[in-house]
Structure formats: structure tokens, C-alpha cells
């Protein structure tokens, strides 16, 4: 799905942009296949295995799976990054997978990601030129630990919960405050990148 200039203006105004249904169904299913076979099993298999991971637990890019590699370097995501940064000279700093299961604690304090993959001291925000993203590969409900994003200039209490259909993506600045939330549902999983 092409990300429009209007959507990118929203990103620059609020510090993040949630794009629902960014991935096609085939791209979403291919990414889930990669996660469930190379990183972490789906909830049912995880519980049947006494909450043990029976995969290779390959969490970092590059993956030996075309579906995961494709979504990491998705042409429309790369295009949006180039337009945000104003250059085709972009670098992927990190790609990693995450899995949250029912019954585990996941809540974090609100924080920024500046400092991850950065050697220097904290600097003033620079017009959102340090871009990060979250993919949600399965549907995320309020019960399945949605990521909480805080719009620029707002207090943490005014967060936006990333309750989205599977295949959605959130672009955000490393200066955008955000936090994990608890998985309050009694079953299920939330795979993310």
C-alpha cells in the first residue's frame, strides 16, 4: 500500500503514523509463516509445548525466510522512508521480531527510542529524521497488548492505542514517546516486528 504525502504530513505533525492494512493478505500470511517457523510459535503450539519455544528463535534481520525479508524491505515502506528523510541514501539500523503471549507481563514505562543504535549523547529532536516502525502481523485488540503511542506535545495519558487489523504498520520517530501495554486477554499472541 502506497503511503501518501498527506499521511506523511500526519507523521511529521504527531510523531507517528498508523497505516492499517499496509500489507496485502499474502504478505501478512508469509510474514506470519516466517515468525511461527523461525522465531516463536503461535499460542496454541506454545501452550501445547509447556510454554517452550520450539523454533530456531531467529529474532534479528536478515532472516532465512523470504516473507520476513520482504516486509522488512517492503518497497512502499522504503519509499516512505526516502520521502521522510529526503534522500535515497537510507540505512536499515535494525530489524527484530517480538512475540507477546497471554499470561506474560509486557507493560513498559513510556520512553523514546533515541539511544538505540546511537553512539552520541541525546540531542534535540531533528524533524523526525530518525525513523522506526512497528508491524502488527495479527489483529491487535485492547486485550492483546497494543503499543501505546503519544502524539507530539501531549501528556502520556493521551496515548493512542495501536488497536489495528493484522498487516498494519506504525511509522514513528525515535523521539516519539510510546510504551508497551499489558496482555489482558486470557489466551492468544501478538507477533510484531
Language-model regions: role of each:
Residues 15-16, 167:
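Catalytic palm active-site di-aspartate
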Amino acid at each position: 500500500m502506497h503511503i501518501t504525502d498527506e499521511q506523511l504530513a500526519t507523521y511529521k505533525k504527531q510523531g507517528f503514523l498508523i497505516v492499517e492494512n499496509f500489507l496485502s493478505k499474502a504478505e501478512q500470511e508469509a510474514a506470519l509463516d516466517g515468525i511461527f517457523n523461525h522465531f516463536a510459535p503461535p499460542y496454541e503450539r506454545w501452550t501445547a509445548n509447556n510454554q517452550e519455544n520450539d523454533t530456531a528463535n531467529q529474532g534479528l534481520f536478515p532472516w532465512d525466510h523470504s516473507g520476513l525479508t520482504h516486509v522488512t524491505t517492503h518497497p512502499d515502506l522504503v519509499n516512505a522512508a526516502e520521502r521522510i528523510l529526503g534522500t535515497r541514501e537510507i540505512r536499515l539500523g535494525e530489524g527484530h521480531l517480538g512475540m507477546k503471549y497471554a499470561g506474560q507481563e509486557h507493560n513498559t514505562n513510556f520512553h523514546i527510542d533515541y539511544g538505540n543504535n546511537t553512539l552520541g549523547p541525546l540531542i534535540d529532536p531533528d524533524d523526525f529524521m530518525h525513523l522506526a516502525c512497528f508491524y502488527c502481523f495479527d489483529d491487535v485488540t485492547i486485550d492483546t497488548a497494543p503499543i501505546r503511542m503519544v502524539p507530539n506535545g501531549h501528556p502520556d495519558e493521551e496515548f493512542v492505542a495501536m488497536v489495528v487489523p493484522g498487516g498494519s504498520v506504525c511509522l514513528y520517530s525515535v523521539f516519539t514517546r510510546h510504551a508497551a501495554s499489558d496482555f489482558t486477554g486470557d489466551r492468544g499472541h501478538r507477533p510484531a516486528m
